[in-house]
Amino acid sequence: MWVGVISLFPEMFRSVTDFGVTGQAVKKGLLSIETWNPRDFTHDKHRTVDDRPYGGGPGMLMMVQPLRDAIHTAKAASPGKTKVIYLSPQGRKLDQKGVEELATNENLLLICGRYEGVDERIIQSEVDEEWSIGDFVMTGGEIPAMTLIDSVSRFVPGVLGDFASAEEDSFANGLLDCPHYTRPEVLDDKEVPAVLMSGNHKDIRQWRLKQSLGRTWLRRPELLENLALTDEQEQLLAEFISEHNAK
């Protein structure tokens, strides 16, 4: 996967390219990340990238010419058809379904806004989709862009050591993840559930599914409203609720 990024602070993306799973993916050639700084496309000695908004009001907007030139240069450098995304509080909220949709694209170009945003005409003429990571405002689009890159790259074949890890993550099947345990068997008088050490794969699978359903019911019940549960899932959820209410 190729990801281009338009940002006034391209150095921030070293946390993606140099570390963790995404850093390993870059080293293996599975993920390519390139950045363009609108300041490099300015024509004045001050390298100005912001301008006053028409109609007045607080704050500044990103200047049109440097931003548009950066976008055009980045698109020309892309290895193929590219989806252009603007990270914006007004965009579609990113969730697991959206992540999987975006992961079907081989090339993405992410535009990171700053100040009060960008000229609406840039969005209309250059942007394919707007995406948000939540109903809150940040100082820029860099962290949302890194969030998107991290989540989407998990679905690039070979990025995760075990691709099933992505398929079994929270939200991958519409549910929250089940609890996980490692050594020691006893920690502060709390024991690992016996079923996980039983070696019975069927029982382990059912326990994990039951805990996943129960955790979703407890913490994010609205997620269950959009799911068509199987007979097995309904039975396991009913058992979890009964056991929970009996405590």
Curated annotation (Swiss-Prot):
GO molecular function, one term: tRNA (guanine(37)-N1)-methyltransferase activity
Catalyzed reactions: guanosine(37) in tRNA + S-adenosyl-L-methionine = N(1)-methylguanosine(37) in tRNA + S-adenosyl-L-homocysteine + H(+)
EC top class named in words: transferase
Source species, domain of life: Bacteria
Principal location listed in the UniProt entry: cytoplasm
Enzyme nomenclature, EC number: 2.1.1.228
Cellular localization per UniProt: Cytoplasm
GO biological process, one term: tRNA N1-guanine methylation
Cellular-component GO terms for this entry: cytosol
Binding site for S-adenosyl-L-methionine: 113, 133-138
Keywords, ordered alphabetically: Cytoplasm, Methyltransferase, S-adenosyl-L-methionine, Transferase, tRNA processing
Subunit structure: Homodimer.
Annotated PANTHER family: TRNA (GUANINE-N(1)-)-METHYLTRANSFERASE
Record family assignment: Belongs to the RNA methyltransferase TrmD family.
HAMAP family: TrmD (MF_00605)
Function: Specifically methylates guanosine-37 in various tRNAs.
Protein name stated in the entry: tRNA (guanine-N(1)-)-methyltransferase
Lineage: Bacteria, Pseudomonadati, Pseudomonadota, Gammaproteobacteria, Vibrionales
